[in-house]
Design a protein with these regions (language model features):
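Sec/Tat signal peptide C-region and signal peptidase I cleavage site
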Residues: 15-21
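Active-site catalytic motif of lipid deacylating hydrolases and related acyltransferases
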Residues: 22-96
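Serine-dependent carboxylesterase/thioesterase catalytic core
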Residues: 25, 77-183
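C-terminal catalytic-base region of ester-bond hydrolases, centering on the histidine
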Residues: 190-285
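Catalytic metal-binding/acid-base residues of hydrolase active sites
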Residues: 31, 104, 135-137, 203-206, ...
Length: 285
């Protein structure tokens, strides 16, 4: 399906227009309220590697929004819409590739699912080529339920998920089931999203102290994710079950099918320069 879409886009461009698309990239973080997502959420090496896929290297934006709020909140989707709308207009972007991680996939899916909610949404939707969603929490995660119930996870997951924020509450499994059925497109039994939503799925966590791969993205973070994986399905990235990551849109690939050395991507590694993920994303622009 993805290859067919690429073929259609290429052929349509050749025969239908002489106007060269102006491609841009928006990189959208997950849960949290960062002020410097470029350095602290993604890492400069990841962002600058992805940037190399652009003809015009200035056509890239790294979003900083308050994704501790509900996805529809003005500080979340409103902030994202403002950044994307201004980016599209100021740079004359006509071909926007959106790269998301974790809960960021839910926020962009809210925008694509509710075009009448905000006057900026149609412009954004019309100019999106597709979304590449890394480890999206499309069906929620049991760990959000655990945090909201106030058990032992609340402290141990604070660095990853936050502490009983609106976004954590939203990502409870039953809550996401409601939103998917009522407000969001792209899941089973629901209409398709207006633009492609292609998922990259993290299937496992490795944290062996003797394995150099365990240190990519942060060794202690991977140790923590391997611990939380004990409360998830066998196929998970330590934070989100594979079934949730595949829950909306179209599967692009499972980590081991494309990564260097067939390495799995933990939830922390899927936002860092690990195992050629950055190169895969760069080559897809």
């Amino acid at each position: 399906m993805r290859n067919l879409l690429i073929l259609v886009v290429v052929v349509s461009t050749i025969v239908a227009t002489n106007v060269h698309a102006n491609t841009g990239v928006a990189i959208v973080h997950g849960t949290g309220n960062p002020t410097d997502a470029y350095n602290k959420y993604w890492g400069s090496k990841f962002v600058e590697s992805v940037r190399q896929g652009l003809d015009n290297s200035s056509n890239l934006i790294v979003v900083n929004c308050n994704f501790d709020k509900y996805m529809w909140d003005d500080a979340a989707a409103g902030c994202l819409a403002n950044d994307l709308y201004n980016f599209i207009n100021s740079k004359n972007i006509s071909d926007l590739v959106v790269i998301t991680h974790s809960n960021g996939g839910n926020v962009i899916r809210w925008i694509m699912s509710n075009p009448t909610f905000d006057t900026r949404y149609p412009t954004i939707i019309n100019n999106i080529r597709w979304v590449n969603a890394m480890a999206p929490s499309s069906l929620g995660t049991p760990l959000a339920d655990a945090v909201m119930q106030g058990n032992v996870f609340e402290q141990s997951l604070g660095w990853l998920l936050g502490f009983k924020s609106d976004a954590v509450r939203q990502q409870q499994v039953s809550w996401m089931a409601y939103y998917n059925q009522s407000w969001l497109l792209g899941t089973s039994g629901r209409p398709s999203l207006p633009k492609g939503f292609y998922t990259i799925v993290g299937t496992d966590v490795e944290s062996a102290i003797w394995d150099p791969d365990s240190y990519c993205g942060g060794y202690f973070e991977n140790v923590g994710l391997e611990t939380t994986q004990n409360w998830l399905d066998r196929c998970s990235d330590g934070f989100i079950n594979c079934s949730s990551q595949r829950g909306a849109g179209t599967l692009w690939f499972n980590d081991k099918d494309r990564t260097k050395g067939r390495e799995p991507l933990s939830h922390n590694q899927s936002r860092r320069q690990c195992f050629n993920l950055d190169v895969i994303l760069r080559n897809d622009i």
